[in-house]
Amino acid sequence: MQCYTELLPPTGVTHSLSIPFLSATATNLVVVKTSVLQIFSLLNVSCSAEGEIIAAKSARPDQLQSTKLILEREYSLSGTVSDLCRVKLLKTKSGGDAILLAFRNAKLSLVEWDPERYGISTISIHYYERDDITRSPWVPDLSSCGSILSVDPSSRCAVFNFGIRNLAILPFHQPGDDLVMGDYESDSQKQSHEHEMDDSAGNSKSKEGAVHQTPYASSFVLPLTALDSAILHPVSLAFLYEYREPTFGILYSQIATSNSLLHERKDAIFYTVFTLDLEQRASTMLLSVTRLPSDLFKVVALPPPVGGALLIGYNELVHVDQAGKTNAVGVNEFSRQVSTFSMADQSELALRLEGCVVELLGNSSGDLLLALSSGTMVLVHFKLDGRSVSGISIRPLPGHAGGNILKAAASASASLGSDKVFFGSEDAESVLLGWSLSSSNARKSRSESKRIEKDHEEGSDDSESEEDVYEDDLYSAAPDTPALGHRLSVAPSTFASYKFKVHDVLPNTAPLRDIALGQPAMPVEDTGSHLDNICSELELVAAYGSNGNGGLVVMKRELEPVVKASLNVGPIHGVWTASIALGSAAKPMSGDQTNIEEWRQYVILTKPQTIDKEESEVFIVDGLNLKPFKAPEFNPNNDISIQVGTLSNRKRVVQVLRNEVRSYDSDLELAQIYPVWDEDTSDERMALSASLADPYIAILRDDSTLLLLQADDSGDLDELDMSDILGNEKWLSCCLYWDTTHIFSPRGHASQQSTDCGLLLFLLSTDCRLFIYRLPEQQLMSVIEGVDCLPPILSTELPKRSTTREILSEAIVANLGDSWNPLPHLILRTDNDDLVIYKPFISSVEEDGDPHCLRFVKETNHVLPRIPPDSDTNISDKEPSNHRPLCILPDISGYSAVFMPGTSASFIFKTSRSCPHILRLRGGVVRSLSDFDFTDPSLGRGFIYVDSKDVVRICQLPPETIYDYSWTLKKVAIGEHVDHLAYSISSETYVLGTSHSADFKLPEDDELHPEWRNEAISFLPELRQCCLKVVHPKTWTVIDSYTLGPDEEIMAVKNMNLEVSENTHERKNMIVVGTALARGEDIPARGCIYVFEVIKVVPDPEKPETDRKLKLIGKELVKGAVTALSEIGGQGFLIAAQGQKCMVRGLKEDGSLLPVAFMDVQCYVNVLKELKGTGMCIVGDAFKGIWFAGYSEEPYKMSLFGKDLEYPEVVAADFLPDGDKLFILVADSDCNLHVLQYEPEDPMSSNGDKLLVRSKFHMGHFTSTLTLLPRTTASYEIPSADSDSMEVDPRITPQQVLITSQSGSIGIVTSIPEESYRRLSALQSQLANTVEHPCGLNPRAYRAIESDGTAGRGMLDGNLLYQWLSMSKQRRMEIAARVGAHEWEIKADLEAVGGDGLGYL
C-alpha cells in the first residue's frame, strides 16, 4: 500500500500560446509544462543600463524599458497536454478568447477565464475514445499515437487528428454563420461518447438572432481516408489564412517514409489543401502538390502578406502559396541527395532543421524566426512580388544580435505583440525575447505599417460592398484589386537588421538525468561555531539540461540562510531592528543613494526576567558586528515589548510596550510617553499587538479595543478620534497597509490619486469580518464576510454553509513578490499555525465605487505546520507567553516576504513567476526575526533572528538561488551534457560523466574500407565526446577531468566501497565507470570498466579547492557494452551488466577485475541495483521486463528468483521494503509505475517464479531515476514523552522511493500502514467525486489505477489528496465526517506521505 506525491512540479515548457484571455484587450501568455497550466500577464518595467530592474515609484521616463512575465494563476491538470489553440467565441465571461486544449487519449477541453472567480472555467469537454474507432488490430493504442490540433484562424471550427487516421471536427458558432446543426444530431453522433458540459456564461447569440445553447455545434469524427483514400500516413496539418471557408493543408504519404529505403521512397510526400463544408459534413480538395521531399515533417500556416504554407523538412524549407506554386531552399548539402525537388541552394549554411520551432516576427515583412535544436536562431525572409513569393532566403542570426541566447532546443513558441516573442524549452530556460530593427529599417517598417493599415481599411470597405458578388470565392472576401496587390508588396529585398535581447526567463531544471546525495560543504565565511543546526545532513544534487545547457542543480528542502555573523548573549526572547536618520533627509526606500554615515541601525534584544518583565539590550550595528549601546532611557521599567519601529520619516524610534508607547530620538533618548490605558475612564489596558505605518500606530488592547495614534510633523504622538464602529467594535487583529496598487480603493478615488499611495487599516473583528478603512478620513471601503470559514472566494457575501469555522489568531495584509512589483495578499493565521493566503482582485467593473467588486481568491498551500516536540514546548519558565506575530519584511534580498516565527518557522515567498508558497527556514524554533540593513551595499538587505538555543544570527538569502518553488534550487552551469553523477564519499567531491558534440569523420586508415579515404563531405555527423569531471562542492567548479576515447560513451558512474587488496582485505571508496565502445551497427560493441580513486594532491595556491585528482586504479576491457553497475555482497565486489551477461567481479591488486560469478540476461540491461547488504538485486531490461535475482558468496553464485511476465519496457527500478514485505517499483516507457511484489508463499506466484503485480499507476512523466531512501519521522508521528505510545522495532527503518523525471518533476512513493491507507483511500474517492477539477478532467481515469484483483491495492494519488487542504473549513469537516476520521488524523496522514520524510535533505 503506497502513495505517490509530487514534491516539485514539472519545469520544462512543452506548449505555449499568446491570447487575450483575461480580457478582450489583455495580452496573456499561456504556458503548459506537461500537466501544469500557467497563465501569465505582461508587465512593462524600467531598468538601468546594467539590466537591474527599478521599482515603479523610482522609475524615470528616459530609462530603458523591459517586459516581465507575471503569473496570474496556475493549475495542476489530471492529464498530459498534447496541444492547445486559441478560439474566439461569440461570448465569454471575460470578453477575451477561449483556449482549446488537447490531451492524451483523445480528449478536448474548452476553457475560458471567469473574472468572478479569478480563474478558468470549463465550457465543455469532449471525449473521442470510441472502441470502434480506436480499437483495431493494426492501429496502435491511443497512448502510443501522437495527435494534432488546429483551429481555423476565424475560429469557425477545430480539427483534431488522433489515433493516426481519425479526424474529429468541432464547429464553433460565429457571427454570420449559416450552421443549421444546432438541433441536428445523427445516429453516429449519438454514439460518439462525447460529453459536453454546459458551464458557459449563458446562451450565445449571433448577429442573425439565432440563439445557441452552447458556443459550439455538435462535433463529428471522420476517417482521414474520407477526405482522400490516399491519406494513409498523415504527417502534419494546419488551417490556412485568407480562405472564406475553413480550409487546411495536410502533409501525408501513401507509403511510410524511411531513411533506410530512401533510394526507393524518395519524394513520397504529398501536400493537399481541403476546404470543409460544416453543414454537409463534406470536404473539397482545392489543390495538391506531389513528389515533395520525404523528410518534410511540419506545416506552418503563414498570414498575410506572405500567405500560403511553409513546409519544414530536415534539410529544406518549401513554401506553397494558395495557387499551388512552390518555392524551396536547401539548407545543407544533403538536400540535393535526399530529394530531386527543385530548390534554391543555400547548403553553405549547414543547418539541421530537425526539431526546429518557427515563429512569425510581428512586423509587416512576414519574416520568420527559426529556433534550431542546437539553440541557434535563424531568420527566414520571403521575397515578395505582389501576392506571389518569388524566393526564400535564410540567414543565421549573429551572436552579437542575440543569436546565441537559446542554449538548447525550443519546444514551443508564441508571438507577443509587435516586438516580443516567447520560446519555451524542455531542455533549457524558457525566454521572453524582445527584438528591434536598425534605425533605417525601423523607420521604413513604421511607414509601411501605416500604409498597410490605411490600405487594409480601404480593402475592407471594398470587400464589404462587393460581398454578394464574390460570395462563392473560396479565398479572401475580395478579389485581387490593385490596391491589395500593392499592399502585399511590402517586403524589402534585403534582410532587416534584427537585434534580440532577453526580457525575462522561466527557470527550468529539466530534464533531470541523474541524482546523488552528498554532504554539504561548510560555508566559506568564518561565522563562528553556531552552524550546527542550519545546515542539512545531506544535499540532493541532480544533473539537468541538455547539450551546452547541462549542469548541476542543488536542491534544498528548506531555506538555508547565509550566516554573516552570529553571537550568543544568553537567553533571548525577541529581536527588533530600527534604522534611524541622523541627518535631515529620509532614507530612500530602494537603493543606497545616501551616505551610510547619515544612518544608524539599532538592534534591540529582549531578555526575559519574569513572566511579565524583560530586559531590553540595545546594540548598534558596525559592519557585521553588534556593539553594545548605552541607552538608559530605553525601557527602564523592563516592560514587555510588543513592537519596535520608526516614524516621522525614520527620525523617531517607537517602542510599543504592554502599558505604554515610548518615542525616542536618534540617540534613543526619551522624547515622549503615551499611555495605553483608557484616559477617559482610567481603566487599565494592555497592548497585545501593534502595527506601524508612518505616521500611524494601530494598537490592539486586551479588551479587544483599538487605539489609533498619529505622529505630527515634530514626531509627537496623539490619539486619533475614531468613529463609533472603530471605537466600539471588538477586534481580533489589526494591520496598517500602504496601498500602492489601488486595488482596495474605489476606482474613482484611485484614478484621481493614481500617483499617491493610500493608507488602509485592516481590522478583523471577533466575529471574523474583515473591515477595510481608509485613513485619515476613516472611510469604510469594504466589509468581507465569513473570513474564518476559509472559502475559496472571500467577498462581501456570507458563505452559504458556514456552521463550521476556523479559529483565527491573526490577519495581516502585506506585499509579496519581487521588490519591483510587490502585490498585496491577505494572510490568515489559525490557532494551530496553519497559513491561509488570499489574493485580492476586482471581480466586477459595472459600477464605479461599488464595494462588492473587491474579492479575495484563495491560493494553494499544501505545507502543514509542525507539531512542536516536548523539548520545544517549555523553552523557558521566564519567557513571556505573548503571541509571536507574523513579521512583514518589505525587502529581503530583493523580495517582499512574510515570516512566521515559532515551531513552524517559515517564509511566505512569491516571485513574479510563481504563486505564493511556504519556504521553511532550516533549524529549530525561531523565537523572533526582523529585517536587517547591511552597511555594505553589495550585501543588500537581510534579516536577523534568534532561535531556541539563544543564538542570534545575521543572515541573508543565498545568492543565485531560485525561490519559485517550495524547495530552493541553485543551478551550477557545467557547459556540457551531464548524463551521470556520483558523490565520492572519501574526497567529498562530485564526479560527473559529461559529453559534448564533436564532428565525426570516417577513418582514412581503415584497411577494410579504402573507399572511405575518398569521401568528400563538409556537413559531418556529430558524435558524443565523453569525459569525467570532478566538481568541488565548495566552489562548484571543475577541478579535474579525464577524457575518454572518441568512440567511447559513458553508460554508468557509481561510487562503490570495493576491496582493493586480496591480502589485507582493505576497502576503499572508488569511482567505477562503465563505458561502451560502439563503432557502428555492423561491428559488435565492446565495453570497459574503469576504477578511479579521487586522491589528494598539492593544490594551486590561488585555488585551494584544486586539491583532488582522479587516479586510474584499474581498467578492464570486456565483450559487450557495460550498461549498468552496482555494488553487491559483503566482500567489496561489484556486479556489471556487460552485453547479455551480468558478471560479479572483484578488484585485484594489479588493477584487473576478476570475475567470480555470472548470470545470462536478455537484451539490454539498463537497471542493476542491490538491496544493500543482502545480495538480492534487480535486473531491469529495456525490452524484457524486470528480473529478481540473488548473489551468494559461499560458493560464488548468481540465482534467478523471479521475474515479471508482463515484460514492461523498464526505464528505472528500485526496491521498496515495507516491514516483512518486499516490493519492487518499476517505471516503464509509457510513464507508468508498476508495483511488484516477491511473495513465494502466494499460490499465484508459482513458488516465487512470478513477481506479483500489485498495482499500476500513471505518473504522467517520463521517469529518469528511482532511488531508495530512508524515511525520517514526521512531526505528527513523534510520540510525546508522557504518552503511552506503542513500541516500534527500532531495527526496522521505514523506506521511501524518490522519483525524478525528464520533465523536471520530483515525486516520492511512501509505504503507508493499513489504517492510514483506508482513511486516505476513502478521502481520495470523496475528492475525486466532489472537487471541481480543472478542464473537467477525471483524476481517477488519468491515474488509471489497476490491481491484480486479489490482494492488490491501488496506489494513492497524493496530489489529489492534498486538495482537501485547499477546501473551506465546512467542506473539509464534511468530507472528514464521511471518511470517518478526525481532521488531525487526515493531516497526520498527509504529512506522512509528503516530503517531511526527507528530514535529512
UniProtKB/Swiss-Prot annotation:
GO terms assigned for molecular function: RNA binding
Keywords on record: mRNA processing, Nucleus, RNA-binding
Localization of this protein: Nucleus
GO biological process, one term: mRNA processing
Compositionally biased tracts (Basic and acidic residues): 187-198, 445-457
GO CC annotation terms, alphabetical: nucleus
Disordered: annotated span: 181-208, 444-472
Keyword RNA-binding applies: yes
UniProt feature, compositional bias: Acidic residues: 458-472
Disulfide cysteine pairs (residue numbers): none
Top-level taxon: Eukaryota
PANTHER family the UniProt entry points to: DNA REPAIR/RNA PROCESSING CPSF FAMILY (PTHR10644)
Family of the protein in this entry: Belongs to the CFT1 family.
Cited function: RNA-binding component of the cleavage and polyadenylation factor (CPF) complex, which plays a key role in polyadenylation-dependent pre-mRNA 3'-end formation and cooperates with cleavage factors including the CFIA complex and NAB4/CFIB. Involved in poly(A) site recognition. May be involved in coupling transcription termination and mRNA 3'-end formation.
Protein known as: Protein cft1
Species name: Aspergillus clavatus (strain ATCC 1007 / CBS 513.65 / DSM 816 / NCTC 3887 / NRRL 1 / QM 1276 / 107)
